[in-house]
Structure formats: structure tokens, C-alpha cells
Amino acid sequence: MMKFSDTASCRDGGERPEEEGKGAGGRSKLRMGKEEFTGSVGKEEAAAVASMSSSKDRICSTSTQLSQLHGFPPSMYPFAFSSNMRGSPPFDLTNGGAYFRSFPTDLPKEMASLSVETQSTSSEEMVPSSPSPPPPPRVYKPCFVCNDKSSGYHYGVSSCEGCKGFFRRSIQKNMVYTCHRDKNCQINKVTRNRCQYCRLQKCFEVGMSKEAVRNDRNKKKKEIKEEVVTDSYEMPPEMEALIQKVSKAHQETFPSLCQLGKYTTNSSADHRVQLDLGLWHKFSELATKCIIKIVEFAKRLPGFATLTIADQITLLKAACLDILMLRICTRYTPEQDTMTFSDGLTLNRTQMHNAGFGPLTDLVFAFAEQLLPLEMDDTETGLLSAICLICGDRMDLEEPEKVDKLQEPLLEALKIYARRRRPNKPYMFPRMLMKITDLRGISTKGAERAITLKMEIPGPMPPLIREMLENPEAFEDDASPPPKSEQKPIKVEEKPGEKTSTKDP
């Protein structure tokens, strides 16, 4: 048996235990101050007792040091528990923390934090803290470029979604813009689309980073490479044949930009005027040739000749301007901001305005820029042109159901071809179809422009343009007959006492 004498106190100096000696049978006596441990113990037990005594010695020493911090006697810190505290938790927490209530209010910060932490972590009943309120929504400064509402920090500055996308596209495609004024245009949320040159310059001025765009592009490319494409698009032989026929019809009636010998003219290249007659005559001549090629393209489309003559004419009149605009916009060169016609004539934006496009100019150039991300090849352009032409929702059709049946394989062919060409971009097909809606909007404005244009030109509108692009009723007041050279594309029949009438081409 071991005897424990607890008459010792930390105030006695906290002496270390001493082993007085061993008797027979392995009896040993340990002394620590006035405490004595006697009994039959082995080496392991003696070591355990010594460790306990050493720990008690360290606690007593700590208590003495703490008492000297603020003048409290060691008895206030019950680290060395007295006999009546055995079996109770430290500081008698189950008693309501009476020991802490006895402390003065001016405890050192270290002791105050210790007491709070001990209470919160030792209590059996935890009081849940009230949920913190949600953080307020982040408010960004207005767009540094156009002062519109900002969506966050993009490429180094606070900017709106519009300016972010414009800057990204401009850098990724190495766009070169031209200012048609004094290169000092005001850029705000109303005027930001009027001058791309000044808008891009302001992006640089406010601190947008080219390098940030390149890093973002590389990251997206890496993500695309990691995608696994599981869809397979099988193409039956009859669809392959359809695609080849449409592609061949397009290429043989519309040479690509790389096949043309481009040339330019200096006529009114620097400033806008209401109408440059020299450019207008050249443009009307080229437009007439282009219309003839579109008619030839339509006749070579599979199934088009099976429609009634009336439906063929209706479809051509309705879609001719759509296809004309689509074709010229595919010959847009963003670096020089120019468009090239079928004979190689290349006009800049100002010259296109002066040639007769007028207020339609910026709308046409904006559409051309929207086509660039689609990266359509000749086959896709031909299929999209055919879909524009053979469309059952045109007014005054005799057999709209038959037209819809002819359009269905064209839609399927474009979908499969586009997805096979871009396996990682299945969204390209619907984006191409959406361009048909844009083309129709441009055609509507083009018809309005033709009516005002006839008031600006000195003579009559060229007959084929009048027949295919405009409403003939709008030109009934034209008194002078057109020159014979301009009547070649269509057949006319004149009778005495009757107005000149046109027959089907």
C-alpha cells in the first residue's frame, strides 16, 4: 500500500521528489517536500510517481508566476487541487463558475481570454451562435470605357459585358479598325458602337491588358482539348451528294476572295457624301451581275426547278437581297475594314456609304463582323444561301408545303456538316440559322433605302435591281425608260398605248 500525505503546499517551494532508499523486497520511499510515498513499488511505478510529482511541481511554479502578474496569492489559482476538490472538474464549472466570479474585474487580458475559453469549451450545453448576416452585394465602379453598369473586373479594369467582349474579340482576331473622323470620338454607352477604333483605343487608355486576353484564350483552348466528343454524325450517301451539288453551285457562281485580283479606287475614300455617282454606277453594274449569278445558283439547286414558275419568282424576289448581302459580307476584310465585289473592286466603309448604301452601311458592316466568329467555308455559305432561298414562310407561295419539304434536307445537311467540321462546337449550327433573321432585317431596311435612293440618283433605277430587289409599285412614276444596255438581263415586251411590263426571267 502507498500512503499519501497531503500536508505539502506549493508555497513550500515545490521540492523535487527524492528516493531515500530501497529496502528488502523492492520497497522504496519517495520524498517530495513534506509528502512521503511508501510502499512496495517497482521501477516503473517509481518512474510514474516521479513524473506525477514533476508535473505537480511545474503547475505550482506556473501558479506562483501568475500570482505575481497582478498581485494575486497562489491560493486564488486552484491548479494544485485541495482534498475537497478531488473528483470535481477544474474551477468547479458545474457550480456556476464561482471561482471566476470571485476574480476582480481588472484581470489581465490573458487571464480573461483563458477564462472565457475554458467556460465555452468545457460546458456540456453549448449555446448556438446567431447566424452571421449575408455579406452585402458587391458594387463595382461604372465601366471605365463607356460608363455603363459594370459586371466586374475584366482584363484589369472595371468594365461592362459589352466592352469586355469587344476587347476580347478585337485582341483575339487582331482586328484593325479605322476612325472616319478625327480619332477622338466620344465613347459612352450610346455611342460606343459607332467608332470601333476609338473604342479600342479607350480600352487601352483605361488599362485593359492584351496579355490577360491571351492567357484567357489559352486556358479555354486547353479546356476544349480535354473535352471528349462522343457524338458521331453519320452522313448517308444521298446527303453527301446534296452537299456536293449545293457547294459546287455556290462556288461556280461566287468566286472566293482568294481567287479575286483585288483593286481599289480613290474616289471619295476619305469623307462621306450623300452619293458619289461614279461609285453608284459601278456598284449598280456589279449588283446587276450578282443578281444574275444568284438566279443561276437557284436554278442549280436540287429540286428548285420542280417548283411552279410563280413560286420560283416569289422565292427569288424575297431572298435575293438576303443572299446578296450574305455574299458580300463573306468578302469582308476586318484588317482594312473593306469589302470586295466579284470583279475584285475593293471599297472601304466610307466608299460603300457613298456608293449608295447610305444609312445602311454601318448595319451591313456590323453583320459582316458578326459572321467572322462563325468561320464559315464555301459549303456552309452555299447551304445557308439555299436555306434562305427555299423557305416556305414567304408570302404568296402557291405550294408552301412543297417548299418546306425541299428545305428539310438542306437544314439537316448544314447541321451534320457544321458539326462534323467543328466537333467541339455544336452551337455553331443554330448560330448560323439565326443569321437568316438578321439578313431579313437588313433586307427590309435595304428596301426602304432603295426607295430613298431613287430620289438621289439622276436616272431610273436599273431594271433588274428594280425587279428583283424592290417593290415595282414604288417606281411607277418613273417616266423615262431605262437604257437598252440595262434591259439585257430581263425580257421586256412593249405594246402601243401600254406601260412597259416585265416577263419572267
UniProtKB/Swiss-Prot annotation:
Residues 115-124 have a biased composition (Polar residues). Isoform Delta-1A and Isoform Delta-1B are most abundant in regenerating limbs, tails, and the anterior half of the lower jaw. Isoform Delta-2 is broadly and uniformly distributed. Signal peptide: none annotated. Pfam families: Hormone_recep, zf-C4. One of its GO terms (cellular component) is nucleus. Residues 52-142 are annotated as: Modulating. Keywords: DNA-binding, Metal-binding, Nucleus, Receptor, Transcription, Transcription regulation, Zinc, Zinc-finger. Residues 238-472 form the NR LBD domain. Receptor for retinoic acid. Retinoic acid receptors bind as heterodimers to their target response elements in response to their ligands, all-trans or 9-cis retinoic acid, and regulate gene expression in various biological processes. The RAR/RXR heterodimers bind to the retinoic acid response elements (RARE) composed of tandem 5'-AGGTCA-3' sites known as DR1-DR5. This is Retinoic acid receptor gamma. It comes from Notophthalmus viridescens. The lineage of its organism: Eukaryota, Metazoa, Chordata, Craniata, Vertebrata.
